[in-house]
Amino acid sequence: MASFAPVKLAFRTVVPDGCDETKPPIIFIHGLTASKEYWMDIPEIVANATKRKAYAIDSRNHGDSEFTDEFNFDCNVEDLLHFMDKEGIEKAVLIAHSMGGLTAIKTALKVPERVEKIVIEDVSVRPPPKEMIGVITTMVTLTNEGIQQVPAGADKETVKKTITEHIGKNLPPELLSNYFFQKNMPKKKDDELRIPMKVGDDGKYEFKINVPAILNALKSPETLMSAPAGVYEKPTLFIHGLLSHFKKDSEEPHIMKLFPNANFVGIENATHTVHNDCPKEFTEAVLKFLQE
């Protein structure tokens, strides 16, 4: 894996009452185009139940972290280790979704002594296939276009309506059921739009990711990440949605080569974003694993 200059990551911290400072803290790592906010109150619940300090970070080119032209999934490993060094974290528990899961996987394999346990949400150990990268590229592009069409000063309902209508009108029919669409688009009328945004000085909404850098990286799937290598023998939990594109039967042999002590939990009624679709079931699975 090539070496990259790390960037400063934004984060939020949860310190539970009665925090046990002798226990390694927990770090939550989001997926592509998400942010630290999209873990909702799960970091608080897990921190309070385990009496461990918890962090939720924004990856580079996401949320409030530094934006840079350099971006691929390998960069995130260097950024995570830099963050741990800056915060004085010798060892941590990693709970990570999708792209963040790949960060956790590669970190655990690279420096297993710095990872006590890991929870991987709805991603395997293999690089994403080109077909999936194409889907993600389409969705990032359409989402960004939709955000740009939102009128300045619009309320939340107008924002949601404008973006979803633009995507719906322009999304190829064969992509309507893909995991990225499922991840971001509301499933019910009162659902929140799972897209990180901010309001600029002109009142216009902006995608809270570095769109040019991410789209440029997605143009070259073969260089998006190097293949994971090594063995992590400590406890590992792979959580997946039973409605997602993750197929345990086909992925388990690849996972077990690198993570021989991996356990698997499938969550009913969950798509790619298990922690958003079924937060109670996700949190219960995480706590059971951490408290074993």
Language-model segment annotations:
Residues 7, 15-19, 40, 50-95, ...:
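Active-site loop/oxyanion-hole signature of alpha/beta-hydrolase fold enzymes
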Residues 23-31:
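Short beta-strand element of the alpha/beta-hydrolase
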Residues 31-34, 98:
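Active-site glycine-rich loops that stabilize anionic/oxyanionic intermediates
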Residues 103-107:
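Hydrolases whose catalytic domains are alpha/beta-hydrolase-1, hotdog thioesterase
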Residues 109, 116-159:
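Flexible "cap/lid" loop of the alpha/beta hydrolase fold
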Residues 130, 150-223:
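Conserved alpha/beta-hydrolase catalytic His-Asp/Glu region
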Residues 188-257, 263-266:
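Conserved serine/cysteine hydrolase catalytic core
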Residues 270-279, 283:
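Catalytic histidine-centered segment of alpha/beta-hydrolase-like enzymes
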